[in-house]
Amino acid sequence: MEAGGVADSFLSSACVLFTLGMFSTGLSDLRHMQRTRSVDNIQFLPFLTTDVNNLSWLSYGVLKGDGTLIIVNSVGAVLQTLYILAYLHYSPQKHGVLLQTATLLAVLLLGYGYFWLLVPDLEARLQQLGLFCSVFTISMYLSPLADLAKIVQTKSTQRLSFSLTIATLFCSASWSIYGFRLRDPYITVPNLPGILTSLIRLGLFCKYPPEQDRKYRLLQT
């Protein structure tokens, strides 16, 4: 195998490994729900939006014929659906959960209908779907920024997951390089905010380490 082929294979494997590692961080929430039989301190919307994101990128991967995208997002969609079903099972407010799920599913179905029925040209469909996936992914990476102000205000990183931050950093970096290698801006660009937000979170962990977090809470009590 040529050097370029080895590099591409290694990069593809890195994307799969790091992304599945990021998705698997939700397993701790799943175990918490099973152990406590409740959804206390667990947010539902990230599961739902990540599932929609996975299904969108899965469609892009199928249309593009990219096996790496197909594998990663197929497994991701299955895991996120599992988290959603568990949340629905243990949540006492099932009506709100079902309403949010139905709303995003309706949007997803409308999107599929538009891309597959009203955009017959394959290249135009690929570009428009790639643009949609990129914008959706960027919005997901930037949405937690509002929480960062609260972290600075409280001087506490309790609401942040260190393992998820590391996984997101490696995941975003590997996909950015992968997209650059393929010369696909729809893959490269949306992962750059993921690198940026992960570095910001790591900076907050350095500024407000867990030990300081505990001392600060003791002073507050």
From Swiss-Prot:
Is Repeat included in the keywords of this UniProt record?
A: yes
Instruction: Assign the protein's first listed, main location to one coarse class.
Output: Golgi
Residue ranges spanning the membrane: these are 3-23, 43-63, 68-88, 102-122, 129-149, 160-180, 186-206
Any one cellular component term from GO for this entry?
plasma membrane
Q: Where is the MtN3/slv domain?
A: 10-94, 127-212
Gene that this polypeptide is encoded by: Slc50a1
**Mediates interaction with TRPV2: where is this region?**
149-221
Which family, according to UniProt?
A: Belongs to the SWEET sugar transporter family.
- Where in or outside the cell? Golgi apparatus membrane; Cell membrane
Describe the subunit structure. Interacts with TRPV2; the interaction probably occurs intracellularly and depends on TRPV2 N-glycosylation.
Q: Its biological function? A: Mediates sugar transport across membranes. May regulate the expression of RAG1 a gene involved in V(D)J recombination.
Identify the domain of life.
Answer: Eukaryota
> What Pfam families does the annotation carry?
MtN3_slv
Quick one: signal sequence residues? none
The name of this protein is Sugar transporter SWEET1
What does the record say about its membrane topology? Answer: Multi-pass membrane protein
Induction context: Up-regulated in mammary gland during lactation.
Please describe the organ and tissue distribution of this protein's expression: Expressed at high levels in lung, placenta, spleen and thymus, at intermediate levels in brain, heart, kidney and testis, and at low levels in bone marrow, liver and lymph node. Within the thymus expression is highest in non-lymphoid cells.
Which of UniProt's keywords are assigned here? Cell membrane, Golgi apparatus, Membrane, Repeat, Sugar transport, Transmembrane, Transmembrane helix, Transport
Q: Which organism is it from?
A: Mus musculus
Gene Ontology molecular functions: glucoside transmembrane transporter activity; sugar transmembrane transporter activity
